[in-house]
Design a protein with these regions (language model features):
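N-terminal binding-site loop/beta-alpha segment at the start of enzyme catalytic domains
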Residues: 1-84, 149
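Conserved, mostly hydrophobic/aromatic
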Residues: 6, 18, 39, 54, ...
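Glycine-rich, positively charged active-site loop/lid region within alpha/beta enzyme cores that binds
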Residues: 22-28, 181, 206-262, 283
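A short acidic, helix-capping loop that chelates divalent metal ions and anchors anionic groups
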Residues: 24-29, 92-98, 223, 296-299
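Glycine/proline-rich, positively charged
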Residues: 26-27, 94-196, 200, 207
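Generic structural signal for well-ordered alpha-helices
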Residues: 43, 66, 70, 111-115, ...
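Conserved short secondary-structure transition element at the edge of the structured enzyme core
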Residues: 148, 250-306
């Protein structure tokens, strides 16, 4: 797997990142999606496939994802320095008035807790997991700048700020005026059928040289090709367990996109998921993929070997 520069930074990451949001997470039935043993198997498969960009958050599995990543590094021979590890802060992590948001107290406490769980003294990339309307932008940008100055954080990013490009612009303009570290990475929802960021948001990332790492690059599995018009929502599937999955994705417009995706996948003798990820890679983004099994992860990583012709890329873009 190749390494690519993340936006205008000097940080190189694997062209496909591995997201750990399923680690320790309970679904609607109370079943843990990915337990510790499976988490280690997935991390092994990702690293053995050449991956070196791991994405997590303090609230994934109530901290278990970070803890397991830290334990995985301790029990494996992989060099932590050869990996880029990203985490996120914002959501409640303790039950007191300062236990969430982007206020200085919560930010600094959260980063300390993240580092302890990961068993490291720094995190390569720290995302703010949401925008905080209650905390002054000046306060959280100054605090984030201090974390970079301390060496506990190397780069700053935003997650799920879309489609409000003005929020990132405002924060980065304050950073520019004050000499603070700016946001240099964005993690929006983006794929062939979720395109809210097309327009102002993507233009903003280009203006500031911000790298884009899409989450949900396969639209929660819709773009894997396992769903079709006739079958509807299969029992026991992720769509059946979700309150809004079917409403969001099971539309005629989205199935028309899926039709083109399946055509291109057939032409390339590749999995639809790999083609959907290749479409994102063609735009210079670094998609963050998740998986419940090593087989799913292998299919996703196959995207690194898929190249679209100009015609195929245009057909997919026009369909979307």
């Amino acid at each position: 797997m190749d390494a690519v520069y993340l936006g205008s930074t000097g940080l190189q990451v694997s062209e496909i990142g591995f997201g750990t949001w399923r680690f320790g997470r309970e679904d609607a039935t109370g079943t843990v999606e990915v337990g510790k043993q499976r988490a280690f198997e997935l991390l092994d498969a990702y690293a053995e496939g050449g991956g070196r960009f791991i994405d997590t958050a303090d609230m994934y599995g109530d901290g278990l994802a970070e803890t397991w990543i830290g334990e995985w590094f301790e029990t494996r021979e992989w060099d932590r320095e050869s990996f880029v590890v990203a985490s996120k802060v914002y959501w409640p992590t303790r039950g007191d008035p300062n236990g969430d948001g982007l206020g200085r107290k919560h930010l600094r406490w959260s980063v300390d807790a993240i580092l302890e769980r990961l068993g490291t003294d720094y995190v390569d990339l720290l995302y703010t997991h949401r925008w905080d309307d209650e905390t002054p932008v000046e306060e959280f940008m100054r605090t984030l700048d201090g974390l970079v100055a301390d060496g506990r954080v190397h780069y700053l990013g935003t997650s799920t700020f879309e489609p409000n490009a003005w929020k990132v612009s405002r924060a980065n303009e304050i950073a520019r005026q004050r000499g603070y570290e700016p946001f240099t990475v964005a993690q929006p929802r983006y794929n062939l059928v979720d395109r809210e960021i097309v327009g102002n948001y993507l233009e903003m990332t280009r203006e500031y040289g911000i790298g884009v790492c899409p989450w949900s690059p396969l639209a929660g599995g819709f773009l894997t090709g396992k769903y079709d018009r006739e079958s509807g929502v299969p029992e026991g599937s992720r769509a059946a367990r979700s309150d809004d999955f079917g409403d969001r994705y099971f539309t005629e417009a989205n199935f028309r996109v899926l039709d083109v995706l399946l055509e291109v996948a057939n032409e390339l003798d590749a999995a639809p998921a790999a083609v959907a990820l290749a479409w994102l890679r063609e735009q210079g983004t670094v998609p963050i993929v998740g998986a419940r099994t090593p087989g799913q992860l292998e299919t996703n990583l196959d995207a690194a070997g898929v190249s679209l012709t100009e015609s195929q890329y245009e057909r997919l873009s026009e369909a979307a």
